[in-house]
């Protein structure tokens, strides 16, 4: 993955993202659990949540977790090439 890492802690599945810590040499960015859900709210099929009920939680398998972390980074405009990504899960 081009000079970057995605580190999942603790590595257990299914899991829910507690937060993402995105770090380079100078900065650290944090996306909270709610930030993650907000980023992904409309990325999932309509039948996963009702129109009047916002997405409360998502439980990921290992492959889904990596794919969605990459989506979140892309939606946030974060270049995967220069960061280490720490995924803290519940």
Curated annotation (Swiss-Prot):
Annotated InterPro entries: Pneumo_M2-2 (IPR009969)
UniProt-annotated location(s): Host cytoplasm
Coiled-coil regions, chain positions: none
Phenotype for residue 46 to C: In strain: ATCC51908
Gene Ontology annotations for the cellular component aspect, listed alphabetically: host cell cytoplasm
A Pfam family assignment: Pneumo_M2
TM region(s), chain numbering: none
Protein name listed in UniProt: Protein M2-2
């Amino acid at each position: 993955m081009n000079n970057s890492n995605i580190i999942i802690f603790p590595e257990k599945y299914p899991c829910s993202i507690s937060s993402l810590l995105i770090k380079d040499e100078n900065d650290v960015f944090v996306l909270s659990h709610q930030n993650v859900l907000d980023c992904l709210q409309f990325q999932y099929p309509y039948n996963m949540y009702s129109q009047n009920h916002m997405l409360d939680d998502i439980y990921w398998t290992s492959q889904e977790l990596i794919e969605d972390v990459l989506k979140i980074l892309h939606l946030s405009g974060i270049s995967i090439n220069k960061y280490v990504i720490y995924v803290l899960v519940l």
